[in-house]
Amino acid sequence: MSTISVVIPTRNDAQPLAVCLEALARQSRRADEVIVVDNGSTDNTAEVCAAAGVRRIAVELPGIAAATARGFDEAESEIIARLDTDSVPPADWLERVEAILDRAGPLTAVSGPGEFYGGTRFGRWLGGNVWIPGYRWAVGLLLGHPPLFGSNFALRAGAWEKIRGRVHRGWPPVHDDLDMSYQIPPEVSVLWEPALRVGVSARPFDSWHAAGRRLSMAWTTFAVEFRSEPPLRRRRRRGRWNRTHRR
C-alpha cells in the first residue's frame, strides 16, 4: 500500500469543486491528503474547502501550470493524483490508482479517459469521440508513449521529482498535463488504462469559442515544448534509452 495525495487546481469554480470533493469523500480508499490549489478565486472556494476539511493553497502566479506544479510540490504522499475541478471520480478511483501504480513500480504514471456529463449532446459526443481519442492517439504518437490527461491521472512521487524542475510554471496559456507529458524522461513509464475513468464536464465543448481556446492552448504548449526539444529528437532519445535499459 502507498499513501496518496490528490491535487485539484481551481479558479472560481466553487460549485463543481464541492461535487468533486464530495466524490472524494465517498472513495472506497480515502485519500491521505487532498490539496486544492486556489489560483485567485473570488467566489466561495475557500468556504467550500473549509467545509470539506481539505487543505487549500493560494497561488498568485496565474495559470493552471503554476497551480498544478505548486500542488505537486506540496504533496507529501508516495502517489500524487490529479483531478480537474469538475472531475467526478467513481468510488473506486483511488483504489484502482493505488493498485495500478503499486504493481507498476517506482517511476510510473497512469492516466485514463473521461466520461462527459452535462453540456449539450453534441458537446458530450465531441469530447468522448473526438477530443479524448484524438488526444490519446495523436499526442501519444508524437510522444512515443501515452499522454497524461489532466482530469484523470496519477504518478509516483519519484516520477514527479524527475520532471518538477522542467515543467513550464510561468506560462499561463500552457496545458499543464501536456507540458508534464512532454517533460517525462525515458526512465519514467506512462500507462493508459481505459477502465480508469472519471466523470468530466462537457462545458468546454458548449461553444466554438471554448473549444477553440483549448486548441489554442494546445498549440501554444507544443510551440513551447518544440523549442526546447524537437519531437523527433525526443522520440529518438527515448528509443535509445529503451533499447539500452528495457531488454
Predicted region positions:
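Short beta-strand-to-loop acidic/aromatic patch adjacent to the donor-nucleotide binding site
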Residues: 78-88
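Glycine-rich, basic loop-to-helix element that forms the pyrophosphate-binding segment
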Residues: 59-75
